[in-house]
Amino acid sequence: MTKIMFFGTRDYEKEMALNWGKKNNVEVTTSKELLSSATVDQLKDYDGVTTMQFGKLENDVYPKLESYGIKQIAQRTAGFDMYDLDLAKKHNIVISNVPSYSPETIAEYSVSIALQLVRRFPDIERRVQTHDFTWQAEIMSKPVKNMTVAIIGTGRIGAATAKIYAGFGATITAYDAYPNKDLDFLTYKDSVKEAIKDADIISLHVPANKESYHLFDKAMFDHVKKGAILVNAARGAVINTPDLIAAVNDGTLLGAAIDTYENEAAYFTNDWTNKDIDDKTLLELIEHERILVTPHIAFFSDEAVQNLVEGGLNAALSVINTGTCETRLN
């Protein structure tokens, strides 16, 4: 019987993974550990592996997988910047991802957390906690229908986000290297700078690559409309975090919401209760009154989890049986 290791198992995924194994006549072993130099030897007797990595995979894992006869790694996220695709290819390892598992879920998160900032919910909540129930100008908002929203990246998630904002009646500008002609309700601009210059809300939906690395830094924030709101449910490396904090502090941004953080791997998805966080930048984000931080959780719905579990396992089995899969990256 074919054997697949399901690394990075969450409690809520285990039953889904085992049920998939029964339906597909595959022996699935679940493990809470991640694929790494320390765990790769567990795969000696396996045919395939799926995992959910957040940090960079060590280079010595690829040749070890090759020596064990394993031909693939099925990543259970859309992002894949934790892998060296060229090195994997050199060792005959197919890297795959799950490019679309519930774009609407992430879009709903992006809009809902932006609305918290638009409606000044953090400020209002702090006032209520001190029993200040007054109405003041600083907590007055304006309707989204009177706003301009910039969507940076109009793939599946960005497109779904744009459609929600369109339902509010917002004016929508966008930038993408490959414009989507079906999104005829928005206006594409020739650059990110043009797309954001009049935006009240900026929503980021681009992958992590050389072009997007620190795309939003001080130079980019200099082109932002004063008082704008920034939402990042894409990848942490898209933002230069110290520059983001500075932009909020000096009033360039009214506020920001980030679901991804460049150095999140050590902390996000882990319980750090009663432990010291050594990352001063992360602490500054968490403690900032005008920055909302969530732990890479925008995708987190029952539909998305099911699709990620099955997407990873389907890709692994496809490579085992055919040598390739529809979602291969290298």
Curated annotation (Swiss-Prot):
Q: Which SUPFAM superfamilies match?
A: Formate/glycerate dehydrogenase catalytic domain-like, NAD(P)-binding Rossmann-fold domains
Q: What class of enzyme is it?
A: oxidoreductase
Catalysed reactions, semicolon-separated: (R)-lactate + NAD(+) = pyruvate + NADH + H(+)
Q: Binding of NAD(+): at which residues?
A: R156, I157, D176, V206, P207, A233, A234, R235, D259
Cross-referenced Pfam families, in alphabetical order? 2-Hacid_dh (PF00389), 2-Hacid_dh_C (PF02826)
Active site positions, chain numbering? R235, E264, H296 (proton donor)
> So which domain of life are we looking at?
Bacteria
Q: Please tell me whether the keyword NAD is annotated for this protein.
A: yes
Q: Name one GO molecular function term.
A: NAD binding
Q: What is its EC number?
A: 1.1.1.28
Write the record's keywords in alphabetical order, separated by commas.
NAD, Oxidoreductase
Q: Where are the transmembrane segments?
A: none
| InterPro entries, A to Z | D-isomer_2_OHA_DH_cat_dom, D-isomer_DH_CS, D-isomer_DH_CS1, D-isomer_DH_NAD-bd, NAD(P)-bd_dom_sf
**Stated family:** Belongs to the D-isomer specific 2-hydroxyacid dehydrogenase family.
| PANTHER family (UniProt xref) | 2-HYDROXYACID DEHYDROGENASE HOMOLOG 1-RELATED
Q: What is this protein called?
A: D-lactate dehydrogenase
The gene from which this protein is expressed is ldhD
